[in-house]
Amino acid sequence: LMPSEKWNFSAFGKYYRQYVAGPMAEDDTGSNYVRTSRTVDSWGYGAAGTYFILSGLQAKLSYEKAYRLPTIEEMFGDEDLESGDIGIRPEKSDNINLNLSYSRSFGKHSVYVEGGVVYRNTKDYIQRNIQDLSGGKEGATYTNYGKVLTKGYNVSARYGFGRWLSVGGNFTQMNVRDNEKMQIGSTGNSVENLGYKARIPNVPYQFADFDVNFYWRDLWKKGNILSVTYDNQYMHSFSYYSQAIGSKNKDFMVPDQFSHNLTLSYSLKNGRYNISFECRNFTNEDLYDNFSLQKAGRAFYGKVRVHFGD
């Protein structure tokens, strides 16, 4: 629905259906497997509207009753260090988003700025937890956790000059908190949740990225483009165990991470042929996954792509 160029409104509905089937181990040894299947059905809905407050300044507001269906890995694991649960339920959440964006062009210059706030009330949150395995190894399991409340914001900006320069970045802060006041104790009774209002473990909550892009158009021949891109990603340190339980939280921290990448691409004949070379983490920083396991260091990639057809 678009009553005018100044504002519009839309409503929508979604139907989710998931059917999965595959072998599941009957015990921890994995000596015997049985074929298991499951079907999940869910309905979602929402509404969104936009309004131009001033020329170039737009407000956006949306609400959605959303579902996140479990992934194959969350249901079946990876037959190595990930243990799945075929009975895991979809996440249910009420999501509210409010955004303000401003765009303007003057001469060869263009500016775009956007900021937004997020509110998400989630039930049956799908959580990835650590478990001890034999031989001193650790693995992961997936469970539904009762209630989780997310409040956050994000800011992004981009500047362009003519057709040869683009600079931009994003910053995000997501406060993901345990919103379950009570939990089931070891004897089956209801007890106070010591992690209530604490950050959900193993979830990054502050991160940012930045990129600079240079373009040389019609280089050596009309329709060819050479582009050079520098980008980086920053992630603030976070805990992969509950910070509300235990006294040595620093032992379970994923440290700050800041990586840098460089990409060189050359496109020929209006994009029909493309060659690119990329160096990821070219400063060889120490990078980690969500369980503080170190990732590979500096890496080089090359890619050739050919577009067939008109």
Predicted regions and their residues:
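Short loop/turn motifs that connect adjacent beta-strands in outer-membrane beta-barrel proteins
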Residues: 2-7, 54-56, 105-112, 164, ...
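Transmembrane beta-strands of outer-membrane beta-barrel pores
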Residues: 15-21, 63-69, 76-78, 104, ...
